[in-house]
A protein has these predicted regions:
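Feature captures the FAD/FMN-dependent oxidoreductase FAD-binding
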Residues: 1, 6, 13, 49-99, ...
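N-terminal Rossmann-like FAD-binding beta1-loop-alpha1 element of flavoenzymes
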Residues: 1-23, 139-148
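Cysteine-centered iron-sulfur cluster-binding motifs in ferredoxin-type domains/subunits
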Residues: 7-9, 15, 86, 281, ...
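Rossmann-like dinucleotide-binding cores of NAD(P)H-dependent redox enzymes
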Residues: 23, 27-58, 62, 144-191, ...
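Glycine-rich dinucleotide-binding loop and its adjacent helix/turn
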Residues: 50-70, 94-150, 256-267, 271-272
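FAD-site-proximal beta/loop scaffold in flavoenzymes
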Residues: 104-128, 212-288
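A conserved FAD-binding loop/helix module that cradles the flavin
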Residues: 143, 279-313
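Mid-to-C-terminal Rossmann-like scaffold of FAD/NAD(P)H-dependent oxidoreductases
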Residues: 188-198, 208, 305-381
Length: 382
């Protein structure tokens, strides 16, 4: 269930084992968050489509526009003849901010995931001249850079912690700054203001960092008397994502945790219902794409064991071939100077405005050869 990275990974590895696999996907396209939440300037859709086409050619049947809900349940799937079910529905529910004025029917207010998805599938999105983004993760940065490309004159991010706590890479952060995104650290919105049901701006307060909280990051604390108002025509809330369990009918036999996620065995990804497994962001919450792919592979191994009647633990073996070290001799005149990685070329800033062209470009042939030659100095492992 779900044609995102986890579901497709599970389907691929099961198909490689010889099983007939069917994937049910609610949307008209596959790829999950890769297709509908990551903008084209970071990951072009055609790249994902090629990967999905390859998986389909491996024997995986992908049924699009087929949501799992109260009318077509997990139990219905089992009853229709499938011997095992793997739930990989992702974490596609935007978390609420929990402040006054957070109303989806106010003109100019969006949740980050919905905003990115609407833009990606070509749905008309109205953006004001001044855009405020609430949050500090990848969805917040992607939303801010997307808003610029849609024609916003000014885009500002409001993040309640410092740069050190901001969960984005240096590359993504630096690229956003280079494109003109303003980042306001240690600032927390307290209210979304509207004028006649149209976004008017954010009421905010400055913060200071206190002791670490449960996440290990220092807890932001409001500074009394530091309140201020930030005008904006559009507000995009991007403070996190969570799994959406609304497709489960009332009284579903599937057990949940106190965090409202499916309860699974951490090794075998099995739920309390025999033959039903779950994994990826749907179980763990938002993570890295490679972690989602690994969860799909683990799910495939677990399902294979289940169908074979094998109750042993799932072991994830490294698929890399072993390498044997051999001593080599060299001529004295040979250079052993370190060869550094060539810099990745980027689309010039002036070509990014109003364009969703991929900004991280490919190496030229010369640079590619230069990079390949560095492999002659690789550290080998047995």
């Amino acid at each position: 269930m779900g044609a995102g990275p986890t579901g497709l990974s599970c389907a691929y590895f099961l198909a490689q084992m010889g099983y007939p696999v069917t994937v049910f996907e609610a949307l008209p396209i596959g790829g999950g968050m890769l297709s509908v939440a990551i903008p084209d300037f970071r990951l072009p859709l055609e790249v994902i489509e090629k990967e999905i086409d390859y998986i389909a050619k491996c024997g995986v049947d992908i049924k699009y526009d087929t949501p799992i809900n109260v009318n077509f349940t997990v139990e219905d799937i089992r009853d229709s003849g499938f011997e095992a079910v793997f739930i990989a529905a992702g974490a596609q529910r935007s978390q609420n901010i929990g402040i006054p004025g957070e109303l989806e029917d106010i003109e100019g207010f969006y949740y980050g995931l919905r905003f990115l998805r609407d833009v990606k599938i070509g749905k008309p999105v109205k953006i004001g001249r001044s855009v405020a983004i609430i949050g500090g993760g990848n969805v917040a940065l992607d939303s801010s850079r997307t808003a610029l490309r849609l024609g916003a004159d000014e885009v500002s991010i409001f993040y309640r912690r410092s740069r050190e706590e901001m969960p984005v890479t240096e590359v993504e952060y630096d690229e956003a700054l280079a494109e003109g995104i303003r980042v306001n650290f240690l600032v927390s919105p307290t209210r979304i203001a509207n004028d006649d049901w149209k976004v008017a701006g954010l009421q905010c307060v400055h913060m200071k960092l206190g002791e670490p909280d449960a996440s290990g990051r220092r807890r932001p604390i409001p500074i009394p008397g530091s309140e201020f108002f930030a005008p904006a025509n559009t507000v995009i809330a991007a403070v996190g994502q969570a799994p959406d369990l609304s497709f489960l009918p009332p009284g579903s036999a599937l057990e949940r945790t106190r965090w409202e996620r499916l309860a699974v065995d951490s090794n075998r990804l099995a739920t309390n219902v025999p033959g039903v497994f779950a994994g990826g962001d749907f179980v763990s919450g938002p993570g890295m794409v490679i972690e989602a792919i690994a969860a799909g592979r683990r799910g495939a191994i677990a399902i294979d064991k289940y169908l074979q009647g094998d109750t042993s633990r799932v072991e994830m073996y490294d698929l890399k071939p072993s390498v044997i070290e051999e001593e080599v001799t060299r001529e004295e005149e040979e250079s052993w100077e370190p060869q550094f990685r060539p810099e990745t070329p980027y689309l010039p800033l002036q070509e990014r405005t109003g364009s969703f062209k991929e900004i991280e470009l490919s190496f030229s042939e010369e640079k590619a050869r230069q990079e390949a030659k560095r492999c002659l100095r690789c550290d080998l492992e047995k």
